[in-house]
UniProtKB/Swiss-Prot annotation:
Residues 54-64 have a biased composition (Acidic residues). Zn(2+) binds at C9, C12, C28, C32. The gene is yacG. Binds 1 zinc ion. One of its GO terms (biological process) is regulation of DNA-templated transcription. It holds the Pfam family YacG. NCBIfam families: PRK00418.1. This is DNA gyrase inhibitor YacG.
């Protein structure tokens, strides 16, 4: 018998059973999944890292 894994929805905190019966995992619903997607699309969320170098940072193709 396999152990049931329960995770919390990253958007609202609701418990979600991790398995085929939860098609939006790790989210509890399509709504929470789309809210999260919107936050990424609006750049409210980001993966930490070095900032991109742009022309405003003094970089140009003429330097190389």
């Amino acid at each position: 018998m396999s152990k049931i894994t329960i995770v919390q929805c990253p958007q609202c905190g609701t418990d979600v059973e991790w398995g085929e019966q939860s098609p939006h995992r790790p989210f509890c619903s399509k709504k929470c999944q789309m809210i999260d997607f919107g936050e990424w699309a609006d750049e409210e969320n980001a993966i930490a890292g070095a900032p991109d170098m742009s022309d405003s940072d003094g970089w140009s193709e003429d330097q190389y």
